């Protein structure tokens, strides 16, 4: 969703399509907390009902996951999405078994871009930063891993708050950029 469901609902109620939290903060709410709470509950219900409606894996993802599993490479999935949506989605896509560890946005005190999720994943897998790489499609992924001392690979597709991750190089710099996930296997 980009900045999370709460920000999406606030933008919808404020009729703001910019998605910029600082921009939103400049304007008083034109709705009260009760309206927001109700709208957010409706959003979550509909989202849960349609969780897999327009969701699929990018080309090459399944073959990369299978190849990494065949090499006994441990994987951790780190997402800012809440656990109640993440686990059913991974199961529906048939990829939950590839991950030794899944960290969701509501599991820890801080979400990406804070380094805590990456540091926790390293600890959970009993590896150090030098033994790991973060593959991500957003500035939050790259910033989180970089702050944790982990090398980064940025995929140039996916969702990065509506902008190309290659255009975000002023905000953060990945170690490597790839256009296809299968390039990880080369």
What are these regions (language model features)?
Residues 3-5, 61, 77, 106, ...:
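Gly/Ser/Thr-rich helix-start
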Residues 1, 40-43, 51, 78, ...:
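Conserved short hydrophobic patches within well-ordered secondary structure
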Residues 1-63, 69-71, 82-84:
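N-terminal helical cap/lid subdomain that shapes the substrate entry/recognition surface
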Residues 1, 57, 75-78, 110, ...:
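Conserved SAM-binding loop
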Residues 27-28, 37, 75, 98, ...:
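Intrinsically disordered, low-complexity segments enriched in Ser/Pro/Gly/Ala and basic residues
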Residues 31-33, 50-51, 77-79, 127-129, ...:
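Short linear motifs at secondary-structure transitions and domain/linker junctions
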Residues 20, 66-70, 83, 87-186:
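Asp-based, Mg2+/Mn2+-dependent phosphohydrolase catalytic module
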């Amino acid at each position: 969703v980009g900045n999370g469901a709460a920000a999406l609902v606030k933008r919808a109620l404020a009729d703001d399509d910019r998605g910029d939290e600082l921009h939103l903060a400049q304007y008083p709410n034109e709705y009260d907390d009760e309206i927001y709470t109700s709208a957010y509950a409706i959003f979550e219900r509909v989202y849960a009902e349609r969780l897999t409606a327009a969701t699929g894996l990018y080309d090459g993802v399944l073959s990369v996951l299978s190849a990494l599993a065949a090499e006994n490479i441990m994987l951790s999935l780190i997402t800012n999405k809440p656990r109640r949506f993440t686990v059913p989605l991974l199961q529906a896509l048939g990829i939950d078994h590839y991950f030794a560890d899944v960290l969701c946005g509501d599991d820890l005190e801080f979400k990406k871009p804070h380094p805590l999720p990456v540091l926790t994943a390293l600890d959970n897998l009993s590896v150090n930063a030098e033994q790991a790489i973060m593959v991500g499609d957003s500035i939050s992924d790259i910033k989180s891993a970089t702050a944790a001392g982990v090398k980064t690979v940025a995929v140039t597709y996916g969702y990065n708050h509506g902008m190309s991750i290659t255009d975000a190089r002023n905000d953060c710099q990945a170690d490597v950029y790839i256009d296809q996930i299968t390039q990880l296997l080369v």
